[in-house]
Amino acid sequence: SPDFSMYLEMAPVMQLYNVFRNRWCGAYWASKGIRIIPTVNWGNEFTFDFCFEGIEKGSVVAVSTYMASEHDNREAQKEWFMAGYNEMLRRIEPEKIICYNTPFPEMQGNIVPVDYERSSWRYMSYDVVSGEKIWKPLKQVAQRAVIMIQ
């Protein structure tokens, strides 16, 4: 599902709205037969009451360490990320966790790392699985990604 990020400084109503948009898009696409891997985001501990809602227990989920690791490497961001991550593990008990960017060593679970830069729009013509620089239809690339996580 799309990454509608939640930031610590966001107003609570905007955090709730971003969770709603994430789940709505995922539900809509699923109703059209598209396999959905929900992206999980959280803010501070007050968001834990709603940010994990609507995600099936034991499912495959996606998270990103990018904002917690690439911006001034602030320790507070890593602590915030790990608090939400551990709460996500407790509540959702995901089968697999697709992690965009480098996982932190403390992260537990069945983690499938994905290179953040190579998965960005800049590499839409770059096959992240084989390393080939040829254009492939998005559907074909997505099918290969699903095979990798199975």
Predicted regions and their residues:
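C-terminal accessory extensions appended to soluble enzyme cores
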Residues: 109-150
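Eukaryote-skewed repeat-based solenoidal scaffolds used as protein-protein interaction platforms
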Residues: 1-125
